[in-house]
Amino acid sequence: MNWFKENNIFDNKLAKKPAASKLGASPTASRPAGSPAPRRVKPLNKSELAHAAIVKRIGRGSDRLNEISASFVPPEYGFRFDEVPACSHKLEYACERDLREHFLSDNEREAMKSLLRFATNYVLGYINSKDMLTFGRAAGLKLKNELEYVQESECTMCGYKFKDNTRVWMLYVIVRHPPRAASADEEFVPSPNTPDCFEFACCDCADNYPDQLNSHQVYPGINSLHAQRLVEAGFFYQYVFPLEYKTEYFTYNDVKIVHHEGPFKIIQRLLREYKRPNEHIVSITLRTTGGVVLKEINHNVRLMRYRNIYKEPTASDDVNCFTVSSSSELMKALDSGAFDSIQGTVFAEIYGFAIQEFVTGVITFPVRPVKGNYCAVCKKNKMYYSNPVLCCSKCGFTNRYIFNGKYDDLYFHPEAVQTHATHSTHGEFVRYYNLKLHAKICRERLEEYEAQNLQ
């Protein structure tokens, strides 16, 4: 299956987005309507209802008693915005602003958003499997109307129960690297598929951990550099399949802009017309015949639970928002009016890298295995007939470590995820990966690829 991954033939439709050779007139971008905070006279939405039910079930401590976090906006406050669309997160949003959040690939954005959602629940004291399905790429899968599997969360280093709600609302992921081999001739190749490689740590344990370079904050925010390191370490999976991070660098030279409408419109249109979903932009350089006039570099993008963690947000745009703290050459050019005198042709250079594999499934995380976490349907070996069980509504997501890397080389196809409804009293669902359907999809994609090459 490695040949399929290297050639990326399965994601042909996404990868073949045509790149424009010349920037023409852009469609008029209208300013979307604002997204004010929903008033509390309205009924609670699904996320708030689920949180309230889980808090009651696990007995979470009151926020009012957590004095150390009194100055922070509570993690659960943002749930009220889950059904309110945000405006500024979209590339086409008309307001002039820093566009570097859109330099990230869709893979990175999906991974960061999934991790922040998971971390938000984790800090609140639980892991909500239905929430992971709802906010992941699980379209078409049947869900129970009520809660599915819920697991209490804890610091895997000291055992602190986050539901106790007595420590600061922060969460870290620590990557434990195995010790070096005793002899240089006997190099040890670390495997990410072992339960002790990752720790979900409270702030106290993370602060005292000696290897700070491998300690990554994931709540109240996560930055893109840490997300990349976690991907490389094997932290992110799609169900029980690794999310790989193989990259290939590229440069688009001398993209010609004959009639420009200022630096913001130029970069916005370059991102819209040249950047593919699986591409990460490192820098965009604009120049004239006289030399470079602007170079926007993507240093580090951060995804925050709240734009200001000390002030309650009033709009959905300030919840789960991407921010960039480093200075922006684009914003400097807008403030100074540097492009006002440039009337001729502007040339653009785009430098970045493409990620070969796309995020097409629900992203899961290396939670420690729970002993006896199986039922009569998903069984101890987590197999539905000859197919691996991915998620059970009663027992949650199948722990990646159960299969001991057996399916690590399979290229994940979302079409092969299927649901079996049990006949139990509570109407449980088992989601499994149909290996026969997987093989059929592989054959069809390969035949399609070969046919295209013969033309």
Curated annotation (Swiss-Prot):
Task: Identify the Pfam families for this entry.
Answer: Baculo_ME53
Q: Which residue numbers delimit the C4-type Zn fingers?
A: 374-394
> Per the record's keyword annotation, is Transport included, yes or no?
no
* Region of interest (Disordered), ranges: 20-42
The protein's UniProt keywords, in alphabetical order, are: DNA-binding, Early protein, Metal-binding, Zinc, Zinc-finger
Q: Which domain of life is it from?
A: Viruses
Q: Which InterPro entries match?
A: Baculo_ME53
Q: Which GO terms describe its molecular function?
A: DNA binding; zinc ion binding
Protein name as catalogued? Early 53 kDa protein
Q: Which organism is it from?
A: Orgyia pseudotsugata multicapsid polyhedrosis virus (OpMNPV)
Q: Give the classification, highest ranks.
A: Viruses, Viruses incertae sedis, Naldaviricetes, Lefavirales, Baculoviridae
